[in-house]
Amino acid sequence: MKAIDSQDLEKHTPMMRQYLTLKAENPDVLLFYRMGDFYELFYDDAKKASELLGISLTARGKSGGDPIPMAGLPYHAVEGYLAKLVQLRVSVAICEQVGDPATSKGPVERKVVRLVTPGTLTDEALLQERQDNLLAAVYHGKKGFGYATLDISSGRFVIAELESCEALEAELQRTSPAELLYSEDFSEMSLISAFEGTRRRPEWEFDFDTSQKLLLDQFGTKDLQGFGLDGARLSLQAAGCLMQYVKDTQRTALPHINSIVRFNQGDSIILDAATRRNLELTMNLQGGHSNTLATVLDNTTTPMGSRMLQRWIHEPLRDRQRIEARQSALEEILENGLYDELHPLLKSLGDVERITARLALRNARPRDFSRLKHALAILPEIQQILARCQSAHLQSLARIISEFPEELALLDSAIVDNPPMLIRDGGVLKPGYNAELDQWRDLSQGATDYLAELEAREKEATGISTLKVGYNRVHGYYIEVSRRESDLVPLSYQRRQTLKNTERYIVAELKEHEEKVLSSQGKALALEKQLWDQLFDLILPQLHELQLFAQGAAELDVLANFAERADTLNYQRPVLTDIPGIQIESGRHPVIEQVSQTPFIANPVTLSPARKMLIVTGPNMGGKSTYMRQVALITLMAHIGCYVPAQSATIGPVDRIFTRIGAADDLASGRSTFMVEMTETANILHNATPKSLVLMDEIGRGTSTYDGLSLAWSAAEYLAQKIEAMTLFATHYFELTQLPELISNVANVHLDAIEHGDTIVFMHAVQDGAASKSYGLQVAALAGVPNPVILAAKHKLHHLESRDNHNTQQTDSSGVQQSMVFPDPIKSPLEEAMESIRPDELSPKQALDILYRLKDLS
């Protein structure tokens, strides 16, 4: 809809002038304009809503001489429609009637009370309960990127200074924001173009001084040094934009956003975007959430615990002391079987974290208060369990998960056991909570009782069996009589409404009591709403303590969950050491062993200063990728404080985990499979260190044999000799199995397979040494390649192998046999026939015969 100037506005009706003015103030969102019991949309908004929501597109007369496209939806069903729009990354402005229709001259006063955007959701119905819902902002400066995230449904505010495009890509993958703000002159659009919820913001919102003032005002401090934000200029600019956006959309105080944390990549094991994707931590390769590490590890009982677990998975710690504190707490819970006691209690807590945020925003509903009351009542039992614990970490959690006796007593006295969904209908506050409220309710109830008496009395006096007293909002109270008995109605009855089968009447006595009922009900509802608002004021002084309690309860849930998982899935406590290397005995892939229909074959791995690289060979489907991934996942699990699927594991310092596993064309960026592969390889070779764990799978397969082998050889050599990273290098280039003869810290391992005639059985067992063959034809047969093709391939394979056996074996300077690295090109039958011709020895007849034969071969 084009902008409307003041002259254009005069052409419209007063109501449409009001709408157009509000729409001009909110041009980039759908405007839900409240009219009675409906939200209406007009013009382009109506057309868009009709298309997205499947609601009818109609017209509302004319205004300014033109028909007005209109679509509407009932106010009581708005949450469902909002949920659908949010999933489509569409933002909505909610415009409510704030004036009194009885006293308004012209259109009732309306204003936009909130903006619903994908990154600023707090309504329970709109949120995924087990996933963080993050609003993010990114700012690009000369020294890198500033990145900030805010979860308005919890108050968690985090910033990060990022030096490179790769680091930003990894953060975007880790945080997966629902909405991403960026500045007008952002120059790296290729990094964020894949996100649906991007919003361009004016440059002034990222101004450093403006941002700093916004944050100081929000936190009520004179400086930001106490938050440890020195040198975080770019990320503070991003954070300032976030705060401005949240203030614009929420239009209320935000007391639960009371601190900000700096995320330092050096505090956790760095995982780039490719690694997070390839290891399928919280999202599988198809974009879903099934069969991921999170689904196996997550048996938490609270939504806030589940969300914390996912954050832990994406932020594996490097600080051994913090990891071992988690391990010790887990061990005590496990050895004493405390998780069986804790699970039902923790489950009763619900989602206190998000309830607390809604309290802070003053949009909590009656059932939020009821759930909070129930959660606070559970705390003494949790405290009794924690009081028996010796772990320092559990004792610290016990101090955070403190009891709230005064708040519990207040809520217990105020909120009924099963409150209605909304305060507007009343009936939320208990009888006895407020004497004046009880008085108005009694008057209302007394008037209601009178109506029952009136109905019985009038039935008896008139002899009308169908007579009954009813009420609706339009006509108020009435006496209803069926059409067939309407002739029995006394003259004192005044007709109020005629329906198809009934007549409705009013009498003076009923009118008088109607006024009493409506007056007492209205005053009771008004007072209850006032007392409801005061309830927020009484609870909010404990907001910070409630937030700490929610965080502590979430962590206790994760630790109890880890104990249950360790017991149920036979996980063992890993040992963290300062000695470089990774030693795993009988390791298992945590996801594959749960979804596999056959018993999982456990395998060992040993990486040390003397054994930095393993060249992994074996058949396709033999388990090379599974083996490598399980090493990475076990390492990651050890660094979040979880027990691991292994008989034992001793793990030294790890700073990064890299994976180069699988690839596909990146059509959006115009990159081929091989380009994607080489880009990821380059990132590893530039950033890996001796403390990095590197998984390299089938490097070089996206190009020609010679180029691919050369690149794979050189990359392996560079990782082993130059970087000395802990590396698992899977390959089908058997030439690479000669590397251990040339480089002392490289060793061969292979995954075994056994042939039975033309079939193959994969043993999935890792053995020392190189594989004897690749079993490619057998795997092709298992995949369903037609038998004639398999037979032809066998014939060609025997031909090539026999030629190799007769070739002179030349060795190049690196020790690789020349015929293996650069085999002779395979000649066609036509080429072979041409080479056999001796022109000087042919007669004209022979030459003509050969010419016909060559024509047949061509």
UniProtKB/Swiss-Prot annotation:
One of its GO terms (biological process) is mismatch repair. InterPro entries: DNA_mismatch_repair_MutS, DNA_mismatch_repair_MutS-lik_N, DNA_mismatch_repair_MutS/MSH, DNA_mismatch_repair_MutS_C, DNA_mismatch_repair_MutS_clamp, DNA_mismatch_repair_MutS_core, DNA_mismatch_repair_MutS_N, DNA_mismatch_repair_MutS_sf. Belongs to the DNA mismatch repair MutS family. The keyword DNA damage applies. PROSITE patterns: DNA_MISMATCH_REPAIR_2. ATP binds at G618, P619, N620, M621, G622, G623, K624, S625. This is DNA mismatch repair protein MutS. It comes from Shewanella woodyi (strain ATCC 51908 / MS32). One of its GO terms (molecular function) is mismatched DNA binding. Keywords: ATP-binding, DNA damage, DNA repair, DNA-binding, Nucleotide-binding. PANTHER family: DNA MISMATCH REPAIR PROTEIN MSH1, MITOCHONDRIAL, DNA MISMATCH REPAIR PROTEIN MUTS FAMILY MEMBER. GO terms for cellular component: cytosol. This protein is involved in the repair of mismatches in DNA. It is possible that it carries out the mismatch recognition step. This protein has a weak ATPase activity. The keyword Heme does not apply.
